[in-house]
UniProtKB/Swiss-Prot annotation:
Function: This enzyme is specific for acyl chain lengths of 4 to 16.
Residues bound to substrate: 152, 263-266, 383, 394
Protein name: Probable medium-chain specific acyl-CoA dehydrogenase 2, mitochondrial
Pfam families membership: Acyl-CoA_dh_1, Acyl-CoA_dh_M, Acyl-CoA_dh_N
Signal peptide: none
Residues forming the catalytic site: 382
InterPro entries assigned: Acyl-CoA_DH_CS, Acyl-CoA_Oxase/DH_mid-dom, Acyl-CoA_Oxase/DH_mid-dom_sf, AcylCo_DH-like_C, AcylCo_DH/oxidase_C, AcylCoA_DH/ox_N, AcylCoA_DH/ox_N_sf, AcylCoA_DH/oxidase_NM_dom_sf
Keywords: FAD, Fatty acid metabolism, Flavoprotein, Lipid metabolism, Mitochondrion, Oxidoreductase, Transit peptide
């Protein structure tokens, strides 16, 4: 359905021209895409969120529905069978799905991080095979970089690869791999130069590894604080043989490939936090209009009004930053600066929401308790809040040193 919307009366070239200019208004096609995603979110995700949170079951049926509507992997180009949507359009979908449930959203859009390095560094054969498969079927792919001793410090990756003939042999373990139990293929980063003094930019090689390759062991599903239906596991590689044609980008350039993916995907992470915050504001306002204290609805108390107004202001500011970062990607500009600003500010506002609900917010009968648990991960993945601040400060200082101003 959304594939057709993306090809309506506005041509793709004209649409790209419009989305590549900062605008405070969405065009009609973007509004239709957003409305369709939000309709699916409210009708399918919201009613099922608590069930999947409790069971921890992977939401295959919902994933299949999302794929049939064009809501899964919408950024895959048309030439590989996808809808060919822009980053901004994809961001609108992530925001709308996250309004319903960020765990279910991650089940649907989780392959995005694995897609990015293939899109950036893959050759035509790799893109046709692996992006084409994701466009054709509701399957999962995983970004397989984090290790037990290497999270934000990607240079600390210990998984190694050794070239033998026309193959590479991979050995090592990866941790916290989203979708790891169901992935048809993995993006894997491994150290190809054993010399610890070799710069990161030359020490690692990136691979596409098929999920059914001999030597891959998928660990148990982790029991996480939030987003419980998302499948997170340890993946172990023991003498895994990968053909040379599955090297992604030049040998030794894997670190750059892995890091470049974040510039494409951070707007989506920010959009996930944004959709959750949007839901928080809606739940807060509805509760304030219903709950009574001291003889009137709590919405009539100034302290509550201040809380709601602060949430509304911060939400709209985050939305503008997130949309700007998505527009930056469509414009070929690094998005980390703006996306990092948006992704690093979520949890304090969720805490205020919990305070508004008081004891009811501490109880699972109300949605706030789950929203609080689901929100925490946004301070961690694709760079902790502290790492996001480092990214922001480095880009800021570099820009001032070069241009004499902080204005980007």
């Amino acid at each position: 359905m959304l594939s057709r919307l993306a090809r309506t009366q506005i041509s793709r070239s004209a649409l790209l021209s419009q989305t590549r200019q900062l605008s405070f208004d969405l065009n009609e096609t973007q509004k239709e895409i957003q409305a369709a995603a939000l309709k699916f979110s409210k009708e399918v995700l919201v009613p099922n969120a608590a069930k999947f949170d409790e069971s921890g079951e992977f939401p295959w049926e919902i994933i299949r529905q999302a794929h049939s509507l064009g809501l899964m992997n919408p950024q895959i180009p048309e030439k590989y069978g996808g809808p060919g949507m822009t980053t901004l359009e994809t961001t609108l979908i992530v925001e709308a799905l996250s309004y319903g449930c960020t765990g279910l959203q991650l089940g649907i859009m989780g392959p995005s991080l694995a897609i990015a390095p293939v899109y950036i560094a893959g050759n035509e054969e790799q893109k046709k095979k692996y992006l084409g498969a994701l466009a054709a079927e509701p399957i999962i792919a995983s970004y397989c970089v984090t290790e037990p001793g290497a999270g934000s410090d990607v240079n600390g990756v210990k998984t190694k690869c050794e070239k033998k003939g026309n193959e590479y042999i991979i050995n090592g373990s990866k941790a916290w791999i989203t979708g790891g139990g169901h992935a048809k293929w993995f993006f894997v980063l491994a150290r190809s130069d054993p010399n610890p003094k070799t710069p990161a930019g030359k020490a690692f090689t990136a691979f596409i590894v098929d999920g059914d390759t001999s030597g891959i062991t998928r660990g148990k599903k982790e029991k996480n604080m939030g987003q419980r239906c998302s499948d997170t596991r340890t993946i172990t590689f023991e003498d895994v043989r990968v053909p040379e044609e599955n090297v992604l980008g030049p040998p030794g350039a894997g670190f750059k490939v892995a890091m470049s993916a974040f510039d494409m995907t951070r707007p989506g992470v920010a959009a996930g936090a944004l959709g959750l915050s949007w839901r928080c504001l809606d739940e807060s306002a509805k509760y304030a209009l219903q709950r009574k204290a001291f003889g009137t609805e709590i919405a009539n108390h100034q302290a509550v009004q201040f809380m709601l107004s602060d949430m509304a202001i911060n939400l709209e500011l985050a939305r503008l930053i997130t949309y700007k970062s998505a527009t930056d990607v469509d414009n070929g500009v690094r998005s980390s600066y703006n996306a990092s600003k948006s992704a690093s500010q979520r949890i304090p506002r969720i805490r205020r929401l919990l305070m508004l609900f008081r004891c009811n917010g501490f109880n699972s009968e109300y949605p706030v308790e789950k929203l609080m648990r689901d929100a925490k991960i946004y301070q961690i993945y694709e760079g902790t809040s502290q790492i996001q601040r480092i990214v922001i400060s480095r880009m800021l200082l570099g820009h001032v040193a070069q241009n004499g101003t902080s204005r980007m």
